[in-house]
């Protein structure tokens, strides 16, 4: 297994699909990385040479991925909550942020129903 950005990449998958296993890299960015490093998208990871894997590592290192990206996202959410803006308040209350209805739906965000006290 090749190790890129601290993640073990599966050998049996195609390069584009294997790169999407890294948090912060989707299909589009994986294709762009393959094009920039001139690695075939349909080549499997086990077929790549060590030099090609090194170029993939360097290309992925240019992006914010994995732990740094997770930390950045959580800090952005924390900043919104500290500001006390509408989105921050919705995060704090675990409600939908983008105008969805909450009278009947939003069970995923709100959690399980609480029993009604009589």
Curated annotation (Swiss-Prot):
Residues 94-118 are annotated as: Disordered. InterPro entries: Rbsml_uS13_C, Ribosomal_uS13, Ribosomal_uS13-like_H2TH, Ribosomal_uS13_bac-type, Ribosomal_uS13_CS. It comes from the Bacteria. GO terms for molecular function: rRNA binding; structural constituent of ribosome; tRNA binding. SUPFAM superfamilies: S13-like H2TH domain. Located at the top of the head of the 30S subunit, it contacts several helices of the 16S rRNA. In the 70S ribosome it contacts the 23S rRNA (bridge B1a) and protein L5 of the 50S subunit (bridge B1b), connecting the 2 subunits; these bridges are implicated in subunit movement. Contacts the tRNAs in the A and P-sites. PANTHER family: 30S RIBOSOMAL PROTEIN S13/40S RIBOSOMAL PROTEIN S18, SMALL RIBOSOMAL SUBUNIT PROTEIN US13M. Part of the 30S ribosomal subunit. Forms a loose heterodimer with protein S19. Forms two bridges to the 50S subunit in the 70S ribosome. This is Small ribosomal subunit protein uS13. It comes from Shewanella woodyi (strain ATCC 51908 / MS32).
């Amino acid at each position: 297994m090749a190790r890129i950005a601290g993640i073990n990449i599966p050998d049996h998958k195609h390069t584009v699909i294997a790169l999407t296993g890294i948090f912060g890299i989707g299909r589009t960015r994986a294709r762009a990385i393959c094009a920039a490093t001139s690695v075939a998208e349909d080549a499997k990871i086990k077929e790549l040479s060590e030099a090609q894997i090194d170029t993939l590592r360097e290309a992925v290192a240019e992006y914010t991925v994995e732990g740094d990206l997770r930390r950045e996202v959580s800090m952005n959410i924390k900043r919104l909550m500290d500001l006390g803006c509408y989105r921050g308040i919705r995060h704090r209350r675990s409600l939908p942020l983008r105008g969805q209805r909450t009278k009947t739906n939003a069970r995923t965000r709100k959690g399980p129903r609480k029993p009604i006290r009589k």
